[in-house]
Amino acid sequence: MAVVIDGKQVAASYRETLKERVAELRARGIVPKLKVVLIGDDPASHSYVRGKERAAEEIGIDSQVLRFDETISEKELLDLIDLMNADEEVHGILVQLPLPKHIDESRVIMRISPEKDVDGFHPENVGKMMLGLDTLLPCTPHGILHLAKTQTEIAGKHVVVVGRSQIVGKPVGMLFLNESATVTYCHSKTADLGEMTRQADILIVAVGRAGLVTSDMVKPGALVIDVGVNRVEGRLVGDVDYEAVKEKASAITPVPGGVGPMTITMLMHNTVEVASRG
């Protein structure tokens, strides 16, 4: 029976250290400030942003959500980003994705100053991460790495990543490679997925397909991190057959309550990092 990794508990512990750092910054007259841009009325986006607001308030970060109708033009959004880039009191800028179809997401991401890119999506920050340089790391991959470190040593382990998205799959493999793991990527064109996943000491699944990974695809004693979030018959489930796989793995993250809390916590970490540099 696997250890169930309580992402809420791990995140709460990490936020305590962030609270201390924020208190020290405030004592020096520095108030970490995060600006979040929310466009449209997507329920999931509104839920994520509420979670970010609560976390910021708990830690002592001054957060402000700027809400706009989905009719906002790309130029108006880019002009707003320019203003926030120029505002020395703003440490972190986050534009909640997805954006309306008439707005180019990549152009928006690239417009945010790399120094204030607390999502860790700007190509400059991604490039630094690839090179193993100090930078603002993407929040979900960073959270996954932290969760894994609470369970095992990373160096020398075989990490198999299922999924190759720009937000999770690609960067998380690179973070583990930077920690001296051996990393294998799998995706929709992988010939025999089960053959690959059974080799994993650490299996990270980030596809968005409920029940993709079954117990016969997991090596006994593996650490399994499930990043998928899928709604099935009114409840949230991951990409892993949780009930079956937890009988075989050494540790596993649940959905919900696993990776999600760490994503928001690492966003707070990045905001504090930027404020500390100033």
Swiss-Prot record:
Pathway: One-carbon metabolism; tetrahydrofolate interconversion. NADP(+) binds at residues 163-165, 188, 229. InterPro entries: Aminoacid_DH-like_N_sf, NAD(P)-bd_dom_sf, THF_DH/CycHdrlase, THF_DH/CycHdrlase_cat_dom, THF_DH/CycHdrlase_CS, THF_DH/CycHdrlase_NAD-bd_dom. One of its GO terms (molecular function) is methylenetetrahydrofolate dehydrogenase (NADP+) activity. The keyword NADP applies. GO terms for biological process: L-histidine biosynthetic process; methionine biosynthetic process; purine nucleotide biosynthetic process; tetrahydrofolate interconversion. GO terms for cellular component: cytosol. Its EC number is 1.5.1.5, 3.5.4.9. PROSITE patterns: THF_DHG_CYH_1, THF_DHG_CYH_2. SUPFAM superfamilies: Aminoacid dehydrogenase-like, N-terminal domain (SSF53223), NAD(P)-binding Rossmann-fold domains (SSF51735). It catalyses: (6R)-5,10-methylene-5,6,7,8-tetrahydrofolate + NADP(+) = (6R)-5,10-methenyltetrahydrofolate + NADPH; (6R)-5,10-methenyltetrahydrofolate + H2O = (6R)-10-formyltetrahydrofolate + H(+). It comes from the Bacteria. Keywords: Amino-acid biosynthesis, Histidine biosynthesis, Hydrolase, Methionine biosynthesis, Multifunctional enzyme, NADP, One-carbon metabolism, Oxidoreductase, Purine biosynthesis. PANTHER family: C-1-TETRAHYDROFOLATE SYNTHASE, CYTOPLASMIC (PTHR48099:SF5), C-1-TETRAHYDROFOLATE SYNTHASE, CYTOPLASMIC-RELATED (PTHR48099). Belongs to the tetrahydrofolate dehydrogenase/cyclohydrolase family. Catalyzes the oxidation of 5,10-methylenetetrahydrofolate to 5,10-methenyltetrahydrofolate and then the hydrolysis of 5,10-methenyltetrahydrofolate to 10-formyltetrahydrofolate. Homodimer. This is Bifunctional protein FolD. It comes from Exiguobacterium sp. (strain ATCC BAA-1283 / AT1b). The lineage of its organism: Bacteria, Bacillati, Bacillota, Bacilli, Bacillales. The gene is folD.
